[in-house]
Amino acid sequence: MTRDPRHYPDRPYLGVSVAVWRDGEVLLVRRGRAPLAGVWSFPGGGVGLGERLADAARREVREETGIEIAIVRQIDHAEIIVRDADGLVERHYVLIVFAANAISGEARAGDDAAETRWVGAQEFARLNLTEDTRRILAAGNPL
């Protein structure tokens, strides 16, 4: 079995996350795999070696949701550090967060997304969102 380099890493794991907007709603995915299985967040994932951040953002949204996007701008970043009971760094992520408009495609769950959903502001409080997703959504639509 291959070791997951994101578990007890020797350096932070770089990723992207994308707030995709369409008609006043944002696209969220319910994670299908640990460590966030069942939790809602923006689509996103890892940046490959030699891959530009914006290219990784477009690829991850396409893989997880089937939606093609036009990136508007970088809007935030998130630093996630999880320590185990002994204080060792179990996971360390640095996510660059983009805002984008949906330009084509029908939302469908793919890759590690268990479900996708277009969500209006009135629904945010009812969903089990990651802390950073909730914080970014609380700032409102950045477009």
Predicted regions and their residues:
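A short coil-to-beta-strand element that immediately follows conserved catalytic motifs
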Residues: 68-77
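Active-site-adjacent beta-strand/loop module that shapes the phosphate/pyrophosphate-binding cleft
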Residues: 78-106
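Conserved Nudix-box catalytic region and its N-terminal flanking loop in Nudix hydrolases
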Residues: 25-63, 67
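Conserved hydrophobic "DFG−1" position in protein kinase catalytic cores
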Residues: 20, 28, 100-102, 118
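NUDIX/MutT-family hydrolases
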Residues: 99, 108-139
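A structural signal for short, well-ordered beta-strand segments
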Residues: 18, 74, 98-100
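Acidic, metal-coordinating catalytic segment for phosphate/diphosphate chemistry
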Residues: 1-17, 88
